[in-house]
Amino acid sequence: MPPGVRQLTVLGKFKPFGLIAEATDGKSPDDSYQYFLFDPELTGERDDADGNDANFSRQREHELFIRDNCNVRKGYALVEANFIGYWYNACWSNLGRGTEAFLCVLQIACLTIYNTSGEVVSVPLMRTVKSIWPLPCGLLLEQAGEVNPPSHVPFSPVSPILGSREMLRQRKEVGNSSPQNFHSPVAHDLISKRDMPCMSSHLILRDPLEEPGPTYVEERGKLTIMKDYDERTIWTSDRLPLMTSYNKGKMQHSVWAAEFIESNLEASASCSSGIVPDAVLSKRVSFRRIWQAKGAKKAASKVFLATDNSVPVICFLILEQKKLLSVGLQTVEINNEILFDVKPDISWSVSAIAAAPVVVTRSQVKIGLLPHLDIIVLSPENDLFLYSGKQCLCRYVLPSWLGESIGSGDGESAKTDSGFRNLKITGLSDAVLGSINLSVNHSQIFRCALTGKPSSSLANDCIAAIAEGLRSDLYSLFLSLLWGDGHSDLQGSSIHFEWEALCNIFLEICQKPTVVHRKQPKTASESSWEFLLISKFHKTYSRFHNGITSINRLDLEGIVPFDSKICSEETLGSSCELMVQSLDCLHAVYESLKMDNLRKQDLHHLAVLLCNIAKFLDEKCYLDYYIRDFPRLSTTIGACTTLSSSRKPPNLFRWLENCLRRGCLSTNFDDLPDLIRRDGCSIVSWARKVVSFYSVLFGDKPEGRTLSSGVPCNIAPGSYSCNEELTILAMAGERFGLHQLDLLPSGVSLPLRHALDSCRESPPADWPAIAYVLLGREDMALSVFRNFSSSKEFEMQSNTSLISMSIPYMLHLHPVIVPSSESIGLENTKIEDTNSVDGSVIDGMEHIFNSYTQLRYGRDLRLNEVRRLLCSARPVVVQTAANPTISDQEQQQAFTVPKLVLAGRLPSQQNAIVNLDPNIRNIQELKTWPEFHNAVAAGLRLAPLQGKVSRTWIRYNKPGEPNAVHAGLLFGLGLQGYLHVLNLSDIYQYFTQDHESTTVGLMLGLAASYRGTMQPDIAKALFFHVPARYQASYTEFEIPTLLQSAALVSVGMLFEGSAHQQTMQLLLGEIGRRSAGDNVLEREGYAVSAGFSLGLVALGRGGDALGSMDSLVNRLLLYLGAKEERSILVPSLEDHRSAAQITDGSTSNVDITAPGAIIALTLMYLKTESEVIFSKLSIPQTHYDLECVRPDFIMLRVIARNLIMWSRICPTCDWIQSQVPEVVKNGISQLRDDMDNMYEVDVEALVQAYVNIVAGACISLGLRFAGTRDGNARDLLNSYALYLLNEIKPLSATPGNAFPRGISKFVDRGTLEMCLYLIIISLSVVMAGSGDLQVFRLLRFLRSRNSADGHANYGTQMAVSLATGFLFLGGGMRTFSTNNGSLAMLLITLYPRLPSGPNDNRCHLQAFRHLYVLATEARWLQTIDVDSGLPVYAPLEVTVKETKLYSETKFCEITPCILPERAILKRICVCGPRYWPQQIELVFGLRTLGESNLIANSHRELDSDSVDHLVSTFSSDPSLIAFAQLCCDKSWNNSFDFLILDLILWSQVALAYNEAVSTGRLASSGGFVQSIFLASLRKRCEEVLNCSTELKINLRNYLTSEAWPYDKNSKLQKDIIILSWYLKWFNVPSPSIIKAAVEKIKSKSKNSTSAIPLLRLLLPNTHISVIGEIDRVFFPSN
């Protein structure tokens, strides 16, 4: 019969979406536009809509619309991309980067490349490129010829593979439907004549940032640069490395295969000759010609890929001959490389004037990287045909109403109306998947959908399974029957009709075998030439001469529709074979549907069809198998007519049960359908996944992408130690989530749930997030998710993946994505301050009140107290003397703590406000540094919340007049690393303002942002402020010493750790010199800054074998006052004109140079344990030495010695006392109140040395245990702080005899105060971020002291505020690190010289006090309950590694908490009965704990005797409560008898699971399902099955006559149902198998002994009670 006729689904008149969008925007229409449609999968944006549903046609395709040479609009989201200049060519390409797509636009002298995220790269072109073409290995650029290049450039027809590319067309009118090539004027050639021989005619671009490389051609085993400009490219594939070209001179088409060449030698030497040596540059692309054909006068108008019997073919549309020629391809895999060649036996042609590839018949199937592509062909007679390879499937026609609607719309005459009704299709275009544009003969274009995939999921599954399982010739027969159906024009009208139509195909074969037309043999009258053409010799020989002209018309006669009216024996045999293989394919679908609880109705429909097929084929076992599942079919389906035994049907449930009982390797794989074990078969992938999970769970091992048993399985990456863990990885790899697990029958899912339960408690730490979601461990899933999420795209993909693995109806109870803890804050928290004047004032500390601090401190008011103490937005309480006669001016002068609000509050005078007199002469100078410090704090608070600070934001906040506030803000932003957004012009604009504070803040901020980078531009800007770096010819600049000091430290931070020789020599000279100014008071501060900088440059590098390190150290020792026999001074790099050597006579002024030299040596030899330097920095051991060395220098030496000998620092009182020399110990021990016989000078020197040594040791202790919260260090430092506090003013009882008493009589109070506050700061450094209450009470006491209680000044108040801030660092969320860089920053911050006033920068620049920020790190840990998304308390067990002071230690913490330093952190475990245990190992790879939250998941157990109460704990839904009452009521037992029978099949697997657990084949999970429950389930089922009195009679009749009970009058047909349940429960074989076993026993055994042992041997899986019944039926005499 002729091919089936199907009606096209017309979606409407076609109009580019770009025009629709422009019309919406109100733009006037214009014809100068171009567009093409493509599949969104090309750019990774494939929609989830049904690929063949006409309603979603326009949603599943994207459009590239270009207008006015400047604008691109992609898709339906209107993503615009602008480019400048005229464009010639555009296409999508992945540039050899996998799935990432790039839009490549060819312009006059450049190639513009856009990615999907909006980034643009422009690639300059040195020669004229006339077209670009996509290849899997990159973008192919075809260059113009050397002489007289063409005046116009064709467009690359973008390959319509997947419908992704259709040629861009210039639309002169809407009705112009045929593709046209575009031409454009060519710019002048940019390449010179001498370079022309080395140029290739085709270039390949693989990276937008690289230059295009030449391509090569392989000829006779040699590689030659491709320079044939006559080979014009006409098509390339973006999926397969194929290119087609046309040579006009030779009238020849060629097909080329692109291949990579790997080698290491250059090819430039051979450019002149054009011959490439044996090895060329790595990753070059060569082309190998695999097919050629001559005879075509013009190039093929269209080339595309299609498939024919699962083989890719290249199709050429030759318009001059009106033919579509197809050439088959074959692939060969050699050394993991795929090589392409032409398959000689696949070459055919059909008549056509237009053609395009479409996805219609097998949309779910892929042939390698390609989808299954059919061909839509427009014949010369304007008929539209659908081909699957060379087989014509159907003819498509336009609906009749289409012409009527067009004619009626125009309102013309009847004659015109009749013309409209006779519509003819004149052209095809814009094919995307199953949609295409059809041009008709009235200048109209319609978008049409080609219906192929049925709407019925069951029909679609069956057709797809048949396509996968049938042999190619049988599948062609099936297609002819399917598409040749006379009712196919009604396809899609009803889901039920689609299924009935499919069933009718098989039923017609069953009733009347269909015969297929075959090619008639040639008669004797045919010529010898025609006989030769049909011979096998011609088919073989034509491979080498296969051209377009070699196709004889006689060969086309074989490409005709099948005819079902002609019968033959061969056709009858094909029909039977079709039915046999179809039975196997459909049975595989049947077994897969049995694994899905939601497709019971489809299972019944399929069983009816399978029963008819099995009956037709006399497959009695199959027929009996289906009737057992659906017993009522026995009344409608008769028995088989033959008595011969038939095949045993595969039984997936039997395989699962045997797998549970005996293991995977002992099962019979004949129980699995062949399709399930086949790789790439997506139709039965549901059953394949279940089989693979069971296989892995019971001993099968992965071997690549398959298991050792041959079952395909994708396994997610991760470690495993047992089969259960491997099963979880397999489920994660197959994306088999909890929702899919719910769809499985309960008994089948039971072993998989057992595996989940076994691994839930302690899964490995390297699993993917989806594996943890499977386990219900969303806590671990989110930890993994947040550790690896680096972009919003990744976050959305991960969210989608995690949600897909979860249970939809449980997402509101167990969310897998929770909000960040930062968003769970206390927005309305207000400060509670009884002494505040205005509670609503903003003080900049609102951010410290969040969920973390609330959880950590609870209702504790310490944070409120911290906020009150550090508040700078309110007047400060001023304690006044009791004498009321003191003037206001004196009270104002007593105010020594400068803050933003320079006002005081007098509680004794009814909280009167006292403002600072604005007439004070230096009022602005007094406010400068307080405003600077306050702005730094604001910058530190602002930057983390801002997330990203832009250059524009900084410039907009720049004041009109420079001030200290903006200077401090710049410094604060720089400490957070945000000043790298400034460019050089911004930096020099700040410098030209000539404002000291701004310059200081900017230099230090830039150095912090570019710390350790040695960035040349920043270094140049900093060295500008160091006059010693100037050359002799430079004009002298008057740079304040303050700026020079800041510049020196900034240089040190910029060059940190580099040991840059030139910079170190410069800084060494600066320690011994003063600045260009004459401010003698600031010389020490300048030298200290140079020492800081030198130490930073050579940080920890003192032990390196550097050439000039010895001389540098010797000179530093000279600055310390060491005695040297010879001069080792290193000459300066510059002239001494701008600085003079600081000397006192013939030696250096040690009072100036010693601090800087000590600091430099300390940082250079930090943690190096250098005994040499340690001995050089000795402590005075005699009275004479004590009088010669300043006491504060002794403190610096103690700090230096301890930081060098890092490992010797110990938090004990004995260690601190060991720092004190014997002469000092002896002198201090003899102190008495009545000592009159000791020299006063001697005693004062001893006490001064003692106090400074103790303070230095405490500072060393604070740095050694910075941020550790070490209890011993805290107690020790606290005791020394209380000791000095009692010496200043006795407040408590004597702490004991451990400390000497009465030292305050021999030392000034200022020294004691300074040492006290240095110890206090050290104590806060140890307890940084902890908020320790004991330390805070001490700080609050010190903060409340006035001048009457102690030496209260600017420096001491700064120390207390600094210590308070350290104690609550980052609101308790940050702490200090002890790496070299952090210690250096802390040492600079804690330099033991406190300022005496707001403007005191003589010895230490106040801005350096903020460098502690660079020593902080976030080590806080917070736990979030994944069920509620709220922070919770969780107990942790923290394990730290063994150190020199401690062995490996475990301790407990309650979150939120601060973890130990990551260098010593080994393991973190979540413990306690409330949460699932979780263990994080940090030995081999440190995870960034500061950037992720550790999530805790609670598993609460609710015990209740009341069902109502139990349900009410999680739901108040009345329907759910009623359902629980019904199921748990005792009267439900009667109904249970019927419900349990539906679960008989699944219960068998559940019982096998129970056996696997009891025998140890599955690891016990602690009572996941109680074995007594399963045993009671077995007993109850057997009681139900044995209660029927008629069962034995029906069973006897079934065994003897294979007859099912006939109970037509009974509505429920109870006897049939009970018999089927009995047969399945006791594994009764089919009667044919039983009879075969009986006959075998009777033939072998002649005696009258019992046949039960032999029956047991032949029927091993059958229950013993059934075997006894068989014995009684067939052996009654026994």
Swiss-Prot record:
GO terms for biological process: anaphase-promoting complex-dependent catabolic process; cell division; embryo development ending in seed dormancy; embryo sac development; metaphase/anaphase transition of mitotic cell cycle; plant ovule development; protein K11-linked ubiquitination. PC repeats lie at residues 1089-1116, 1156-1194, 1256-1293, 1320-1354. Gene3D superfamilies: Leucine-rich Repeat Variant (1.25.10.10). Keywords: Cell cycle, Cell division, Mitosis, Nucleus, Repeat, Ubl conjugation pathway. GO terms for molecular function: molecular adaptor activity. It is found in: Nucleus. It comes from the Eukaryota. Component of the anaphase promoting complex/cyclosome (APC/C), a cell cycle-regulated E3 ubiquitin-protein ligase complex that controls progression through mitosis and the G1 phase of the cell cycle. The APC/C complex controls several key steps in the cell cycle by mediating ubiquitination and subsequent degradation of target proteins such as cyclins. The APC/C complex is required for the female gametophyte development and is involved in several aspect of development by controlling cell division and cell elongation. Involved in the control of endoreduplication. This is Anaphase-promoting complex subunit 1.
